[in-house]
């Protein structure tokens, strides 16, 4: 299911003295099966884009086409429930959305809200806890007795239980330690790789962009200023700096090594790419 923005603008509090632009004249396509990262400094419009992906916000002008559903400023909210099942949203600190007495009930709540029987919803809960790497015995526990990282996994399992076609992630690893962050990003990558899950990731972590995304949207001052692969986006460090963005840590390390005589072509963006180019130079004495 593609999501297409066609000259989309959104103004907060339109028609009032407090009106402010959220996004301006954005056009682009998030392809079915892609892993798209949306980056940009704070206030660039990332969150506004995100909220258009399942019509939490509707364009002030332009259209957002989600699958076969065209969203305009005039779209009636009553017709959006099926759409919101297709696009699952995982917000920052998703664990704050938990509220049920048990993990099983919390995960089953979403599917039941969309018409799935209690029996089938609980079966989905059983399946989803395994998918997010939690043991079966958490199902009967209170979500509030779990660790913060486990609570976040439960919240994500609740979104996945609705079996969305598109999974939208807003800084999903915020507040996690490096190990927890890596485990969670690997979980999303597995969903993408093994099930063809379309993923949209809003992040400040350039390492995650390099490691996982196949497409990148760069936002600045409400405008979509650049799209491309991670390699295309990270090819110009000066341009990144001008737009208050940086290189992945691996690329920064490669620059430091290049200053000491090592050669890299193309610029490595991930740890595996760096190792592939660095090991032969260390072993074979190919430094300049």
From Swiss-Prot:
GO molecular function terms noted in the UniProt entry: ATP binding; ATP hydrolysis activity; ATPase-coupled transmembrane transporter activity
Keywords recorded for this protein, A-Z: ATP-binding, Cell membrane, Membrane, Nucleotide-binding, Translocase, Transport
GO cellular component, one term: ATP-binding cassette (ABC) transporter complex
Main enzyme class: translocase
Active-site residues per Swiss-Prot or TrEMBL entry: 171 (proton acceptor)
SUPFAM superfamilies: P-loop containing nucleoside triphosphate hydrolases (SSF52540)
Entry keyword annotation includes NADP: no
Membrane topology according to the record: Peripheral membrane protein
Residues annotated as domain ABC transporter: 3-246
Annotated function: ATP-binding (A) component of a common energy-coupling factor (ECF) ABC-transporter complex. Unlike classic ABC transporters this ECF transporter provides the energy necessary to transport a number of different substrates including 5-formyltetrahydrofolate and thiamine. Expression of the complex plus FolT or ThiT in Lactococcus lactis subsp. cremoris (strain NZ9000) allows 5-formyltetrahydrofolate or thiamine uptake respectively; 5-formyltetrahydrofolate or thiamine are not taken up in the absence of FolT/ThiT or the EcfA1A2T complex. Deenergized L.lactis subsp.
Subunit comment: Forms a stable energy-coupling factor (ECF) transporter complex probably composed of 2 membrane-embedded substrate-binding proteins (S component), 2 ATP-binding proteins (A component) and 2 transmembrane proteins (T component). This complex interacts with a number of substrate-specific components, including FolT and ThiT for 5-formyltetrahydrofolate and thiamine respectively.
Family: Belongs to the ABC transporter superfamily. Energy-coupling factor EcfA family.
UniProt name for this protein: Energy-coupling factor transporter ATP-binding protein EcfA2
Species this protein is from: Lacticaseibacillus paracasei (strain ATCC 334 / BCRC 17002 / CCUG 31169 / CIP 107868 / KCTC 3260 / NRRL B-441)
């Amino acid at each position: 299911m593609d999501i297409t923005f066609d000259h989309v603008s959104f103004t907060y509090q339109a028609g009032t003295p407090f009106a402010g632009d959220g996004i301006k004249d954005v056009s682009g396509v998030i392809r079915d099966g892609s892993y798209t990262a949306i980056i940009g400094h704070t206030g660039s419009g990332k969150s506004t884009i995100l909220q258009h992906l399942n019509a939490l916000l509707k364009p002030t002008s332009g259209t957002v086409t989600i699958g076969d559903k065209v969203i305009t400023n005039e779209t009636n909210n009553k017709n959006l429930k099926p759409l919101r099942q297709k696009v699952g949203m995982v917000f920052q600190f998703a664990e704050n959305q938990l509220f049920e007495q048990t993990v099983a009930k919390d995960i089953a709540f979403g599917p039941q809200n969309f018409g799935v029987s209690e029996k089938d919803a609980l079966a989905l809960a059983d399946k989803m806890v395994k998918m997010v790497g939690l043991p079966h015995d958490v199902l009967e526990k209170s979500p509030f007795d779990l660790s913060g990282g486990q609570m976040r996994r439960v919240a994500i399992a609740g979104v996945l239980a609705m079996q969305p076609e598109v999974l939208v992630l807003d800084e999903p690893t915020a507040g996690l330690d490096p190990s927890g962050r890596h485990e969670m990003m690997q979980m999303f990558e597995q969903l993408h790789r093994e099930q063809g899950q379309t993923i949209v990731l809003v992040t400040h972590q350039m390492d995650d962009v390099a490691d996982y995304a196949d497409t990148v949207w760069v936002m600045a001052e409400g405008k979509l200023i650049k799209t491309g692969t991670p390699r295309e986006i990270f090819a110009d460090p000066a341009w990144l700096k001008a737009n208050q963005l940086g290189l992945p840590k691996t690329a920064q390390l490669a620059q430091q090594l290049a200053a000491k005589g090592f050669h890299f072509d193309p610029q490595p963006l991930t740890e595996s790419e760096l190792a592939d180019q660095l090991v032969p130079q260390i072993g074979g004495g190919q430094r300049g």
